[in-house]
């Protein structure tokens, strides 16, 4: 993956409120980009375009955390423990496939995935 191609022809897809920041999702040629609204710099995370469809198919109607996504999706190529799973949930939320719940599971954010 080349950095120049990541930023070519980006389209704004949506945004979602995290606990502390607003996250913006952009669609590029091959990837989705997640960027937090930060005052000190610019940070971008790359999410595979296949992720929203996998979340919709495997978790429709369920409440999930990033950890649950990594453990239960059976797709280590797309979801790993840590921030990649959380970024995947931010993408799902920004695209309207999920919503972030106020309720938490321990310290983890919980997302409700829309039904089929």
Task: List each model region and its residues.
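Long, low-complexity, charged/polar intrinsically disordered regions in eukaryotic proteins
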Residues: 1-55
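Basic, alpha-helical nucleic-acid-binding regions used in initiation and control of genome expression
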Residues: 3-6, 25, 87, 93, ...
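Generic beta-strand structural signal
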Residues: 26-27, 103-106
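Short acidic, hydrophobic short linear motifs in intrinsically disordered regions
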Residues: 46-53, 57-82
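Short amphipathic alpha-helical interaction segments
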Residues: 79-97
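Conserved hydrophobic residue
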Residues: 98-102
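Short, cationic-aromatic polyanion-contact patches
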Residues: 105-116
